């Protein structure tokens, strides 16, 4: 037997050492020191990032919210019923991500982007961080394309443009959600993906919204994210950020999206709850000092991008609930100052039968005017002023009975215009039909129609136009303006219809 040479042995050993791979998992692990109300205090995770996802040995997950000198405050996603003192916590070295893209469209998800509609898993390789930097000034373009809601009072008086943030504000039970759902239903065929984020709502209310969207075929281009009242404060806090991450995907891929946050008052309350448990110092109304920032960084992500970035857009309709009409409370004033205008809904108007209950005097769109089509501008140019004068006259007539002819005429016209702006829920109207009926009211075609019959007049006018003069609607739709010929034809059509219309 030949003896092995010493060099050969050493070279074999050397080779083995070189090729040796240590196959083991490195994990940074900490321990729970205390756990209460959905917040865990964890010791031993020194290198953790802000808002990094952490895994508990119980299977629960959470995010690092407070980075203190000797411990980390972790917001737990669920209720963490099995977490107790001594539970191990592991770093994932990942920030919070949610699935994005066309795979999420038509689905109902929770705040973590997990499906809750029983239609199986979401099959996608595309994920996005829920916290992203908003586009800078140079990446944006001013709002100039209309986003029509199908609601006459909004499209005529407080128009919304793609990339705008328009607040819907009012007391509870004034129709705020209905306005938002109408806007979603009206996006059918407009190539706009809609995202509805329900924060702290009843499960039954959200189920009703989903049912309505399915009924009107809007679920085909919509995503519903639900963090209901029965979910933890952490889930309610994260839901809008998950929603906006999904919307941003379409915005950044040269497409258009609309996101509804229903509602940000409950979002602020959830954040207050988390902050107080994390022992952050409370400020006004016990909200933490950065409550303005949580909403500003959320709403700034809605934008109209410049042509170099693909000209996509993300439009936001945040909803805020007021208490007894008090718009000067902390959260309402914060969000009014962040957004580009507000639609103010009033209880008194709602109960007097004016629905949608939009207070035209307090509602405003700061940038939407540039996005309004010319035809709407032409017919509703003086509408806001006319309605304001009508309200003034109406108040005056309560203690003065004798009015001159001009004032009487103005009062009569005002009453009819209020009727024209009434609209049933879930029945958005195409812009060309809005132009026709507002034109009819503004130019006096309804003066001889009794106030109670104005709604009926409109209901009969649209089928008449579709059957006999579809070209009028078609021309308004394509030209987006009323020229002399089109206006003359519209007058002729309205006069003809008035002859056939019987009350």
From Swiss-Prot:
InterPro entries to which the protein is assigned, alphabetical: ATP_synth_asu-like_sf, ATP_synth_asu_C, ATP_synth_asu_C_sf, ATP_synth_F1_a_nt-bd_dom, ATP_synth_F1_asu, ATPase_a/bsu_AS, ATPase_F1/V1/A1_a/bsu_N, ATPase_F1/V1/A1_a/bsu_N_sf
| SUPFAM superfamilies assigned to the protein according to its UniProt record, in alphabetical order | C-terminal domain of alpha and beta subunits of F1 ATP synthase (SSF47917), N-terminal domain of alpha and beta subunits of F1 ATP synthase (SSF50615), P-loop containing nucleoside triphosphate hydrolases (SSF52540)
Mind telling me which residues the site (Required for activity) is annotated on? Answer: 363
Q: Where does ATP bind?
A: 170-177
Predominantly, its location class is membrane
Molecular function (GO) terms listed?
Answer: ADP binding; ATP binding; proton-transporting ATP synthase activity, rotational mechanism
Q: What is its EC number?
A: 7.1.2.2
The UniProt entry's sequence similarity note says: Belongs to the ATPase alpha/beta chains family.
Function as written in the Swiss-Prot or TrEMBL entry? Produces ATP from ADP in the presence of a proton gradient across the membrane. The alpha chain is a regulatory subunit.
Can you say what this protein is called?
Answer: ATP synthase subunit alpha
């Amino acid at each position: 037997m030949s003896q092995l040479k010493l060099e050969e042995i050493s070279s074999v050993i050397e080779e083995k050492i070189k090729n040796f791979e240590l196959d083991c998992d490195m994990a940074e692990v900490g321990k729970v020191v205390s756990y209460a109300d959905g917040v865990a205090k964890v010791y031993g995770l020194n290198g953790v990032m802000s808002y990094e996802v952490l895994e508990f040995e119980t299977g629960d997950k959470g995010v690092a919210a407070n980075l203190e000198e000797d411990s980390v405050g972790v917001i737990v996603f669920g209720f963490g019923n099995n977490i107790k003192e001594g539970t191990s916590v592991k770093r994932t070295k990942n920030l919070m991500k949610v699935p994005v893209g066309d795979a999420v469209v038509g689905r109902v998800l929770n705040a973590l982007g997990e499906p809750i509609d029983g239609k199986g898993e979401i099959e996608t390789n595309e994920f996005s961080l829920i916290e992203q930097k908003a586009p800078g000034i140079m990446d944006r373009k001013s709002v100039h394309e209309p986003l029509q809601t199908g609601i006459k009072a909004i499209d005529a008086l407080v128009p919304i443009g793609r990339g705008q943030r328009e607040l819907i504000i009012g007391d509870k039970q004034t129709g705020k959600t209905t306005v938002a759902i109408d806007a979603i239903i009206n996006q059918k065929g407009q190539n706009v993906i809609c995202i509805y984020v329900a924060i702290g709502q009843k499960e039954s209310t959200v189920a009703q919204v989903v049912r309505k969207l399915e009924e009107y075929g809007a679920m085909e281009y919509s995503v519903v994210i639900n963090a209901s009242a029965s979910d933890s404060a952490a889930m309610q806090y994260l839901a809008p950020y998950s929603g906006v991450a999904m919307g941003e995907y379409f915005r950044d891929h040269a497409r258009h999206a609309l996101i509804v946050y229903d509602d940000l008052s409950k979002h602020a309350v959830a954040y207050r709850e988390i902050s107080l448990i994390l022992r952050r110092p409370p400020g006004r109304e016990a909200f933490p000092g950065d409550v303005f920032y949580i909403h500003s960084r959320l709403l700034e992500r809605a934008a109209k991008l410049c042509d170099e970035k693909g000209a996509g857009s993300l439009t936001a309709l945040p909803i805020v609930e007021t208490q007894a009409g008090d718009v000067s409370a902390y959260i309402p004033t914060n969000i009014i100052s962040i957004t580009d205008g507000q639609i103010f809904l009033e209880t008194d108007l709602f109960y007097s039968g004016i629905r949608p209950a939009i207070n035209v005097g307090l509602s405003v769109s700061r940038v939407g005017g540039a996005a309004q089509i010319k035809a709407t501008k032409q017919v509703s140019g003086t509408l806001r002023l006319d309605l304001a004068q009508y309200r003034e006259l109406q108040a005056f007539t309560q203690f003065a009975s004798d009015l001159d002819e001009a004032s009487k005429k103005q009062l009569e016209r005002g009453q009819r215009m209020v009727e024209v702006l009434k609209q049933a829920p879930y029945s958005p109207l195409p812009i060309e039909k809005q132009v026709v009926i507002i034109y009819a009211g503004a130019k006096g075609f309804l003066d001889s129609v009794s106030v109670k019959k104005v709604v009926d007049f409109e209901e009969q006018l649209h089928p008449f136009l579709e059957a006999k003069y579809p070209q009028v609607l078609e021309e308004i739709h394509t030209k987006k303006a009323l020229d002399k010929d089109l206006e003359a034809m519209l007058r002729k059509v309205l006069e003809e219809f008035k002859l056939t219309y019987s009350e």
